[in-house]
Amino acid sequence: MPLLDSFTVDHTRMAAPAVRVAKTMKTPHGDTITVFDLRFCRPNLEVMPERGIHTLEHLFAGFMRDHLNGQGVEIIDISPMGCRTGFYMSLIGVPEEQRVADAWKAAMSDVLKVTDQRKIPELNEFQCGTYHMHSLEEAQEIAKHILDHDVVVNHNEELALPKEKLQELHI
């Protein structure tokens, strides 16, 4: 099995909250797709609660588009990481990390403005695969955590696992 890019960085050294360009690629038509690692929690030390991350998934996708789309950027998808420490965001374009961080903070402010769980988009059995597994309160606690901290930039070159370590790990 090929080694995925996300497993070549040292998770023990990742800061959070932080933005990291996880990958860039060109489409056959020459568009640049950028994948961002939006790290909400320090890996192996913190984790977002499942109901909160699920609710945040519903809210974050729309709010980030409100604040980041335009000026050569269009979000394709925002999805939670299975480890529940962050989200991956794929988009067309190459925005600066600070622009992404600013949009992230603005989106978290929007999450705090949601006043009722019934206002969560697509919160029904027809549009959500686990529509009972939500918590606006937990999503707002996650958002507040981001707003209470600086969003920094994680750089791949600073987090790269040495080849010797990858070999030691049998990768």
From Swiss-Prot:
Signal peptide: none
Tagged with keyword Isomerase: no
Enzyme's top EC category: lyase
SUPFAM superfamilies listed in its UniProt record: LuxS/MPP-like metallohydrolase (SSF63411)
InterPro entries in alphabetical order: LuxS_sf (IPR037005), Metalloenz_LuxS/M16 (IPR011249), S-ribosylhomocysteinase (IPR003815)
Cofactor, free-text remark: Binds 1 Fe cation per subunit.
Protein name: S-ribosylhomocysteine lyase
Name of the gene: luxS
